[in-house]
Protein backbone atom coordinates (compact mmCIF):
# COMPACT_ATOMS: atom_id res chain seq x y z
CA UNK A 1 0.00 0.00 0.00
CA UNK A 2 2.75 2.44 1.01
CA UNK A 3 4.81 1.49 -2.06
CA UNK A 4 1.95 2.55 -4.36
CA UNK A 5 1.00 5.65 -2.37
CA UNK A 6 2.70 8.04 -4.82
CA UNK A 7 0.87 6.46 -7.76
CA UNK A 8 -2.47 6.52 -5.94
CA UNK A 9 -2.06 10.20 -5.07
CA UNK A 10 -1.19 11.03 -8.69
CA UNK A 11 -4.16 9.02 -9.99
CA UNK A 12 -6.48 10.91 -7.66
CA UNK A 13 -5.12 14.41 -8.32
CA UNK A 14 -4.45 14.27 -12.08
CA UNK A 15 -8.10 14.53 -13.25
CA UNK A 16 -8.66 17.42 -10.83
CA UNK A 17 -5.51 19.17 -12.04
CA UNK A 18 -6.44 18.65 -15.70
CA UNK A 19 -9.94 20.06 -15.14
CA UNK A 20 -8.64 23.17 -13.38
CA UNK A 21 -5.96 23.70 -16.04
CA UNK A 22 -8.56 23.41 -18.79
CA UNK A 23 -10.76 25.99 -17.07
CA UNK A 24 -7.99 28.51 -16.29
CA UNK A 25 -6.34 28.21 -19.69
CA UNK A 26 -9.52 28.22 -21.76
CA UNK A 27 -8.40 28.88 -25.31
CA UNK A 28 -9.36 29.38 -28.92
CA UNK A 29 -7.72 28.09 -32.08
CA UNK A 30 -5.69 30.47 -34.23
CA UNK A 31 -3.56 29.27 -37.16
CA UNK A 32 -3.29 25.81 -35.66
CA UNK A 33 -2.35 26.97 -32.17
CA UNK A 34 -4.47 27.03 -29.03
CA UNK A 35 -4.21 30.54 -27.56
CA UNK A 36 -5.39 30.87 -23.92
CA UNK A 37 -7.56 33.91 -23.23
CA UNK A 38 -5.64 34.61 -20.04
CA UNK A 39 -2.37 34.86 -21.97
CA UNK A 40 -3.83 37.54 -24.24
CA UNK A 41 -5.19 39.42 -21.23
CA UNK A 42 -1.84 39.41 -19.40
CA UNK A 43 0.05 40.49 -22.52
CA UNK A 44 -2.41 43.33 -23.15
CA UNK A 45 -2.33 44.49 -19.51
CA UNK A 46 1.47 44.41 -19.38
CA UNK A 47 1.82 46.44 -22.57
CA UNK A 48 -0.90 48.92 -21.60
CA UNK A 49 0.50 49.68 -18.14
CA UNK A 50 4.08 49.90 -19.44
CA UNK A 51 3.10 52.66 -21.87
CA UNK A 52 0.63 54.32 -19.47
CA UNK A 53 3.27 54.67 -16.75
CA UNK A 54 5.91 55.67 -19.31
CA UNK A 55 8.12 52.64 -18.77
CA UNK A 56 8.54 52.88 -15.03
CA UNK A 57 10.33 49.54 -15.34
CA UNK A 58 13.27 51.32 -17.00
CA UNK A 59 13.44 54.80 -15.54
CA UNK A 60 12.81 53.84 -11.90
CA UNK A 61 14.88 50.67 -11.76
CA UNK A 62 17.72 52.33 -9.83
CA UNK A 63 15.26 53.74 -7.31
CA UNK A 64 13.75 50.27 -6.99
CA UNK A 65 17.09 48.87 -5.86
CA UNK A 66 17.54 51.71 -3.36
CA UNK A 67 14.10 51.02 -1.87
CA UNK A 68 14.74 47.28 -1.75
CA UNK A 69 17.99 47.67 0.18
CA UNK A 70 16.51 49.96 2.80
CA UNK A 71 17.51 53.47 1.75
CA UNK A 72 14.00 54.79 2.44
CA UNK A 73 13.16 52.64 5.47
CA UNK A 74 11.38 54.41 8.31
CA UNK A 75 10.52 52.33 11.41
CA UNK A 76 7.77 54.82 12.31
CA UNK A 77 5.76 54.01 9.18
CA UNK A 78 2.80 51.61 9.57
CA UNK A 79 3.44 47.96 8.76
CA UNK A 80 5.04 44.80 10.10
CA UNK A 81 8.25 44.18 8.15
CA UNK A 82 11.03 46.16 6.48
CA UNK A 83 11.31 46.86 2.77
CA UNK A 84 14.11 44.32 2.43
CA UNK A 85 12.15 41.63 4.25
CA UNK A 86 9.13 42.10 1.99
CA UNK A 87 11.48 42.13 -1.02
CA UNK A 88 13.11 38.82 -0.02
CA UNK A 89 9.75 37.27 0.91
CA UNK A 90 8.54 37.96 -2.63
CA UNK A 91 11.86 36.89 -4.16
CA UNK A 92 11.65 33.55 -2.36
CA UNK A 93 8.71 32.71 -4.60
CA UNK A 94 10.29 33.83 -7.88
CA UNK A 95 13.85 32.50 -7.61
CA UNK A 96 14.19 28.79 -8.10
CA UNK A 97 12.25 25.96 -9.67
CA UNK A 98 9.87 28.13 -11.66
CA UNK A 99 12.88 29.63 -13.41
CA UNK A 100 14.72 26.35 -13.88
CA UNK A 101 11.98 23.84 -14.70
CA UNK A 102 9.80 26.56 -16.25
CA UNK A 103 12.42 27.49 -18.83
CA UNK A 104 13.07 23.84 -19.67
CA UNK A 105 9.35 23.14 -20.14
CA UNK A 106 8.86 26.28 -22.24
CA UNK A 107 11.73 25.34 -24.55
CA UNK A 108 10.55 21.73 -24.86
CA UNK A 109 7.06 22.93 -25.88
CA UNK A 110 7.74 26.11 -27.85
CA UNK A 111 11.32 25.64 -29.00
CA UNK A 112 14.34 27.83 -28.15
CA UNK A 113 12.39 30.96 -29.13
CA UNK A 114 10.19 30.59 -26.06
CA UNK A 115 13.13 31.81 -23.99
CA UNK A 116 13.09 35.19 -25.74
CA UNK A 117 9.36 35.57 -25.14
CA UNK A 118 9.90 34.75 -21.48
CA UNK A 119 12.39 37.61 -21.26
CA UNK A 120 10.11 40.05 -23.09
CA UNK A 121 7.15 39.01 -20.93
CA UNK A 122 9.22 39.59 -17.79
CA UNK A 123 10.27 43.03 -19.05
CA UNK A 124 6.71 44.25 -19.55
CA UNK A 125 5.49 42.22 -16.58
CA UNK A 126 7.58 44.41 -14.30
CA UNK A 127 5.02 47.21 -14.69
CA UNK A 128 2.10 44.83 -14.24
CA UNK A 129 3.49 43.67 -10.90
CA UNK A 130 4.19 47.29 -9.95
CA UNK A 131 0.51 48.13 -10.52
CA UNK A 132 -0.96 45.19 -8.62
CA UNK A 133 1.37 45.65 -5.65
CA UNK A 134 0.62 49.40 -5.54
CA UNK A 135 -3.09 48.60 -5.37
CA UNK A 136 -2.51 45.95 -2.72
CA UNK A 137 -0.58 48.42 -0.59
CA UNK A 138 -3.08 51.25 -1.11
CA UNK A 139 -6.08 49.21 -0.01
CA UNK A 140 -4.39 47.29 2.80
CA UNK A 141 -5.97 47.35 6.26
CA UNK A 142 -3.88 47.92 9.39
CA UNK A 143 -5.57 46.40 12.42
CA UNK A 144 -5.45 47.71 15.99
CA UNK A 145 -2.79 45.18 16.99
CA UNK A 146 -0.52 46.39 14.17
CA UNK A 147 -1.02 43.41 11.87
CA UNK A 148 -1.76 44.03 8.21
CA UNK A 149 -4.27 42.51 5.80
CA UNK A 150 -3.68 43.22 2.15
CA UNK A 151 -3.47 41.84 -1.33
CA UNK A 152 -5.76 41.32 -4.28
CA UNK A 153 -8.66 40.42 -1.99
CA UNK A 154 -8.66 43.93 -0.55
CA UNK A 155 -8.31 45.93 -3.73
CA UNK A 156 -10.89 43.80 -5.52
CA UNK A 157 -13.52 44.22 -2.81
CA UNK A 158 -12.72 47.77 -1.64
CA UNK A 159 -11.48 49.16 -4.94
CA UNK A 160 -14.42 47.86 -6.95
CA UNK A 161 -16.69 49.02 -4.13
CA UNK A 162 -15.44 52.58 -4.48
CA UNK A 163 -16.36 52.43 -8.15
CA UNK A 164 -19.88 51.38 -7.24
CA UNK A 165 -19.50 47.66 -7.97
CA UNK A 166 -19.79 46.39 -4.40
CA UNK A 167 -21.32 42.97 -5.12
CA UNK A 168 -19.02 42.33 -8.07
CA UNK A 169 -16.00 43.30 -5.98
CA UNK A 170 -16.96 40.94 -3.16
CA UNK A 171 -17.61 38.11 -5.61
CA UNK A 172 -14.22 38.60 -7.31
CA UNK A 173 -12.48 38.78 -3.93
CA UNK A 174 -14.05 35.51 -2.78
CA UNK A 175 -13.32 33.86 -6.12
CA UNK A 176 -9.70 35.01 -5.95
CA UNK A 177 -9.34 33.71 -2.39
CA UNK A 178 -10.55 30.27 -3.45
CA UNK A 179 -8.22 30.25 -6.48
CA UNK A 180 -5.35 31.47 -4.31
CA UNK A 181 -5.79 28.56 -1.92
CA UNK A 182 -5.87 26.12 -4.84
CA UNK A 183 -2.82 27.73 -6.42
CA UNK A 184 -0.87 27.60 -3.18
CA UNK A 185 -1.44 23.85 -2.95
CA UNK A 186 -0.61 23.24 -6.61
CA UNK A 187 2.03 25.52 -8.09
CA UNK A 188 3.07 26.96 -4.76
CA UNK A 189 3.64 23.70 -2.90
CA UNK A 190 3.20 20.42 -4.74
CA UNK A 191 5.22 21.36 -7.82
CA UNK A 192 8.05 22.88 -5.77
CA UNK A 193 8.19 20.00 -3.28
CA UNK A 194 7.98 17.40 -6.05
CA UNK A 195 10.83 18.89 -8.09
CA UNK A 196 13.04 19.44 -5.04
CA UNK A 197 12.45 15.89 -3.84
CA UNK A 198 13.22 14.46 -7.28
CA UNK A 199 16.61 16.17 -7.19
CA UNK A 200 17.31 14.61 -3.79
CA UNK A 201 16.34 11.19 -5.14
CA UNK A 202 18.61 11.62 -8.19
CA UNK A 203 21.52 12.70 -5.97
CA UNK A 204 21.11 9.69 -3.68
CA UNK A 205 21.05 6.95 -6.30
CA UNK A 206 18.00 7.49 -8.49
CA UNK A 207 16.04 4.19 -8.61
CA UNK A 208 18.44 2.71 -6.05
CA UNK A 209 17.85 5.57 -3.63
CA UNK A 210 16.21 4.65 -0.31
CA UNK A 211 13.83 7.55 -1.00
CA UNK A 212 12.76 6.31 -4.45
CA UNK A 213 8.98 6.21 -4.87
CA UNK A 214 8.50 7.91 -1.49
CA UNK A 215 7.43 11.36 -2.62
CA UNK A 216 4.80 11.41 0.12
CA UNK A 217 7.59 11.31 2.71
CA UNK A 218 9.32 14.29 1.13
CA UNK A 219 6.01 16.16 1.13
CA UNK A 220 5.57 15.57 4.86
CA UNK A 221 9.11 16.76 5.65
CA UNK A 222 8.78 19.89 3.51
CA UNK A 223 5.36 20.63 5.02
CA UNK A 224 6.80 20.41 8.54
CA UNK A 225 9.72 22.74 7.71
CA UNK A 226 7.51 25.30 5.97
CA UNK A 227 4.88 25.09 8.70
CA UNK A 228 7.49 25.77 11.37
CA UNK A 229 8.38 29.02 9.57
CA UNK A 230 4.98 30.34 8.54
CA UNK A 231 3.22 29.61 11.84
CA UNK A 232 4.85 32.78 13.19
CA UNK A 233 3.20 34.91 10.51
CA UNK A 234 4.75 37.40 8.11
CA UNK A 235 7.30 38.61 10.68
CA UNK A 236 8.70 35.10 11.03
CA UNK A 237 8.70 34.64 7.25
CA UNK A 238 10.51 37.97 6.76
CA UNK A 239 13.21 37.11 9.31
CA UNK A 240 13.91 33.81 7.56
CA UNK A 241 13.83 35.11 3.98
CA UNK A 242 16.10 38.10 4.67
CA UNK A 243 18.82 35.60 5.63
CA UNK A 244 18.04 32.69 3.34
CA UNK A 245 17.15 34.41 0.06
CA UNK A 246 20.47 36.30 -0.41
CA UNK A 247 22.32 32.98 -0.02
CA UNK A 248 19.89 31.26 -2.37
CA UNK A 249 20.26 34.08 -4.91
CA UNK A 250 24.06 33.89 -4.74
CA UNK A 251 24.05 30.13 -5.35
CA UNK A 252 21.54 30.55 -8.18
CA UNK A 253 23.50 33.31 -9.94
CA UNK A 254 26.84 31.54 -9.41
CA UNK A 255 25.42 28.31 -10.86
CA UNK A 256 24.05 30.16 -13.90
CA UNK A 257 27.38 31.90 -14.51
CA UNK A 258 29.26 28.62 -14.14
CA UNK A 259 27.03 26.92 -16.73
CA UNK A 260 27.35 29.87 -19.14
CA UNK A 261 31.14 30.07 -18.80
CA UNK A 262 31.50 26.29 -19.14
CA UNK A 263 29.60 26.44 -22.44
CA UNK A 264 30.94 29.79 -23.61
CA UNK A 265 31.67 28.55 -27.12
CA UNK A 266 28.02 27.65 -27.69
CA UNK A 267 26.67 31.11 -26.84
CA UNK A 268 26.62 32.53 -30.43
CA UNK A 269 24.85 29.46 -31.79
CA UNK A 270 22.38 29.49 -28.88
CA UNK A 271 21.50 33.16 -29.44
CA UNK A 272 20.96 32.50 -33.15
CA UNK A 273 18.64 29.56 -32.41
CA UNK A 274 16.66 31.60 -29.88
CA UNK A 275 15.98 34.49 -32.27
CA UNK A 276 15.41 32.33 -35.36
CA UNK A 277 12.93 30.16 -33.46
CA UNK A 278 11.18 33.10 -31.78
CA UNK A 279 10.34 34.77 -35.10
CA UNK A 280 9.69 31.61 -37.10
CA UNK A 281 6.29 32.22 -38.72
CA UNK A 282 5.53 28.55 -39.37
CA UNK A 283 2.26 27.18 -38.00
CA UNK A 284 4.10 24.32 -36.32
CA UNK A 285 4.50 23.74 -32.60
CA UNK A 286 7.88 25.43 -32.69
CA UNK A 287 6.53 28.37 -34.69
CA UNK A 288 5.93 31.94 -33.71
CA UNK A 289 2.67 31.48 -31.79
CA UNK A 290 3.80 28.26 -30.15
CA UNK A 291 6.94 29.94 -28.85
CA UNK A 292 5.02 33.03 -27.74
CA UNK A 293 2.36 31.10 -25.82
CA UNK A 294 4.81 28.72 -24.16
CA UNK A 295 7.09 31.59 -23.18
CA UNK A 296 4.34 33.78 -21.73
CA UNK A 297 2.70 30.96 -19.75
CA UNK A 298 5.97 29.87 -18.16
CA UNK A 299 7.12 33.45 -17.56
CA UNK A 300 3.98 34.21 -15.57
CA UNK A 301 4.51 31.11 -13.43
CA UNK A 302 8.14 32.05 -12.94
CA UNK A 303 7.88 35.75 -12.04
CA UNK A 304 4.30 35.84 -10.67
CA UNK A 305 3.30 39.00 -12.56
CA UNK A 306 -0.43 39.53 -12.73
CA UNK A 307 -1.54 36.52 -10.69
CA UNK A 308 -2.21 38.38 -7.44
CA UNK A 309 0.24 36.63 -5.12
CA UNK A 310 2.87 39.39 -4.95
CA UNK A 311 0.59 42.01 -3.29
CA UNK A 312 0.10 39.64 -0.34
CA UNK A 313 3.84 39.53 0.36
CA UNK A 314 4.39 43.26 -0.09
CA UNK A 315 1.34 44.58 1.79
CA UNK A 316 2.80 44.26 5.34
CA UNK A 317 5.90 46.40 4.59
CA UNK A 318 6.42 49.57 6.64
CA UNK A 319 5.57 52.43 4.30
CA UNK A 320 3.16 55.35 3.99
CA UNK A 321 3.48 55.81 0.22
CA UNK A 322 2.28 52.85 -1.88
CA UNK A 323 3.60 54.13 -5.21
CA UNK A 324 7.06 55.10 -3.97
CA UNK A 325 7.44 51.89 -1.97
CA UNK A 326 6.29 49.50 -4.67
CA UNK A 327 9.10 50.48 -7.01
CA UNK A 328 10.99 47.70 -5.26
CA UNK A 329 8.82 45.12 -7.04
CA UNK A 330 10.51 45.85 -10.37
CA UNK A 331 13.70 43.76 -9.87
CA UNK A 332 11.80 40.67 -8.66
CA UNK A 333 10.26 40.13 -12.09
CA UNK A 334 13.69 39.79 -13.69
CA UNK A 335 14.60 36.63 -11.78
Feature locations, PLM:
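Juxtamembrane inter-helical linkers in multi-pass membrane proteins
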Residues: 64-75, 142-159
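Juxtamembrane helix-boundary/capping and inter-helix hinge elements in multi-pass membrane proteins
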Residues: 107-114, 140-149, 161-163, 315-325
